[in-house]
């Protein structure tokens, strides 16, 4: 019994009932016979010579009347392990250093919660369904919004660089002529503010959808898209009344000031039979820049 007390953890000892013996396994392959006859507190089976050996994960608490805790040890004293535990492989230890610095994030994303007019939201979904049902079976308002977002980033960059020749097939001719005059009168900082990087577009919304026929019977669909984007162009806040200003800090770098601007692009497509299925931009507006 003294040998078992040294090899087995204390919770494996059980209430003693005379007359039977059972085998208790230690953490090694050595088996010890003890004169114990009891009921397991977990499965309520009688532990006898015919019972299966107690698995290593089975725990039975000792009876309060039979506990023998021995001499008390300090709660924070050094733990002493049995010789059976010495043969077990040591678990890997991961060391930490107070000098290690966490990896710095290179980008900071801004999340803006936008709430559109519920009436307008329902209206645009109804018109989107009509476009799908009567004009284009492959039309999806979600896919169109994603494509419009990419087109906005591309066209706005060309506008800021005054590359109007590359916009001739993307923007309506009468609209492009007006844009040339407006962009030419802008300062360099205002031109830079026209460009919207696709990663700086923080919110996109469907403004309006219209379906109409002209006097020649041609079918047209217009979709107005609204975009909100951040720009780091150096623009005096007085010239952009109503614009929101944000300060963005990336890691340990200096604080960068960005302004939140908005733009509206109206996309148009003719669904007349035999016409090339291309979307063109029929209107471009940049709040406080191109109006």
From Swiss-Prot:
GO terms for cellular component: mitochondrial inner membrane; mitochondrial matrix. It comes from the Eukaryota. Keywords: Mitochondrion, Transit peptide. GO terms for molecular function: ribosome binding. It is found in: Mitochondrion matrix. One of its GO terms (biological process) is protein insertion into mitochondrial membrane. The keyword Calcium does not apply. Promotes sorting of SMDT1/EMRE in mitochondria by ensuring its maturation. Interacts with the transit peptide region of SMDT1/EMRE precursor protein in the mitochondrial matrix, leading to protect it against protein degradation by YME1L1, thereby ensuring SMDT1/EMRE maturation by the mitochondrial processing peptidase (PMPCA and PMPCB). Interacts with AFG3L2. Interacts with SPG7. Interacts with SMDT1/EMRE (via the N-terminal transit peptide); interaction is direct and takes place before maturation of SMDT1/EMRE. This is m-AAA protease-interacting protein 1, mitochondrial. It comes from Rattus norvegicus (Rat). The gene is Maip1.
């Amino acid at each position: 019994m003294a040998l078992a007390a040294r090899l087995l953890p204390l919770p494996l000892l059980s209430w003693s009932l005379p007359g039977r013996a059972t085998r208790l396994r230690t953490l090694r392959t050595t088996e010890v016979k003890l004169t114990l006859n009891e009921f397991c507190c977990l499965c309520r089976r009688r532990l006898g010579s015919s019972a299966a050996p107690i698995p290593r994960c089975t725990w039975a608490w000792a009876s309060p009347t039979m506990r023998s805790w021995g001499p008390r040890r300090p709660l924070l004293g050094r733990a002493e392990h049995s010789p059976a535990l010495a043969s077990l492989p040591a678990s890997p230890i991961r060391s930490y250093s107070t000098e290690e610095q966490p990896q710095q994030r290179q980008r900071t994303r801004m999340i803006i919660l936008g709430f559109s007019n519920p009436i307008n939201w329902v209206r645009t979904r109804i018109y989107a369904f009509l476009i799908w049902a009567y004009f284009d079976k492959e039309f999806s308002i979600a896919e169109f919004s994603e494509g419009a977002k990419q087109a906005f980033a591309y066209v706005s960059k060309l506008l800021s660089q005054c590359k109007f020749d590359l916009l001739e097939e993307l923007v309506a001719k009468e609209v492009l002529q007006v844009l040339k005059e407006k962009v030419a009168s802008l300062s360099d900082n205002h031109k830079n503010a026209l460009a919207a990087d696709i990663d700086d577009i923080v919110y996109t919304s469907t403004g309006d959808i219209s379906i109409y026929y002209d006097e020649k019977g041609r079918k047209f669909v217009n979709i107005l898209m609204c975009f909100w984007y951040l720009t780091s162009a150096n623009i005096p806040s007085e010239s952009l009344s109503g614009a929101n200003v944000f300060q963005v800090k990336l890691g340990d770098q200096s604080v960068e000031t960005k302004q939140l601007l908005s733009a509206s692009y109206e996309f148009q497509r003719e669904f007349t039979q035999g016409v090339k299925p291309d979307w063109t931009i029929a209107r471009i507006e940049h709040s406080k820049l191109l109006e």
